[in-house]
A protein has these predicted regions:
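Extracytoplasmic ligand-binding sensor domains of the Cache superfamily
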Residues: 62-117
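Juxtamembrane segments flanking the first transmembrane helix
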Residues: 1-86, 146
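Cytosolic-side ends of inner-membrane transmembrane helices, especially those
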Residues: 25-33, 158, 162-176
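N-terminal membrane-entry
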Residues: 11, 145-169
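Extracytoplasmic
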Residues: 96-156
């Protein structure tokens, strides 16, 4: 009888701790992911305002909240389509990982899908209308996503170790 109660107590205590840790981890990870999307969308809005180009700021006066190096760190490309969805031009000058042909292929795939925002692999994309048709803009989010996934893995590993530690402590204390 006592062994049965002891077992139930250990299971309930460890389950409660696991539930709380999973809830906390879930909230933190969701907030982190939303921040990645928000930052990417802000950068993309700035690029859209400048017709798919990174704006030039006055010397020594970067945009508030932006590093003067952001212009050189931001990897993006844009493809311009006419109203019937045919490619007019592509700007791949700010990315080395994607050739112009690939950029056009990605843009046509997104344009045909009818979606305005989302991810295509590690690229956050946005479709905006222009006077000639549409601009499909892609922003490389690989660094941010890589950090997010490493944080997620580390969080789960630490949580698993923590839950196991609580299990051992509760198990030992329940025998007294």
């Amino acid at each position: 009888m006592i062994k049965k109660l002891q077992k139930r107590f250990v299971i309930m205590a460890v389950s409660a701790v696991a539930a709380v840790l999973i809830l906390i981890l879930g909230v933190v990870c969701i907030a982190n992911y939303r921040e990645i999307i928000s930052d990417a969308d802000k950068t993309m809005a700035m690029l859209e305002e400048n017709n798919g180009n990174y704006p030039k700021f006055e010397e020594g006066k970067p945009k508030p909240g932006m590093s003067p190096e952001a212009r050189f760190e931001t990897r993006f490309f844009a493809v311009f389509l006419n109203k019937s969805g045919e490619t007019i031009s592509a700007n791949t000058g700010s990315i080395a990982a994607v050739a112009t042909d690939e950029a056009i292929e990605y843009a046509e795939e997104i344009y045909e899908s009818g979606k305005n925002k989302g991810f295509l692999g590690v690229y956050r994309y946005s479709v905006s209308q222009t006077d000639k048709g549409a601009m499909v803009l892609f922003l490389d989010c690989s660094r941010s996503l890589d950090i997010f996934y490493r944080f997620l893995e580390a969080s789960f590993a630490v949580s698993a170790v923590g839950i196991f530690g609580v299990f051992i402590i509760v198990l030992l204390l329940s025998k007294k």
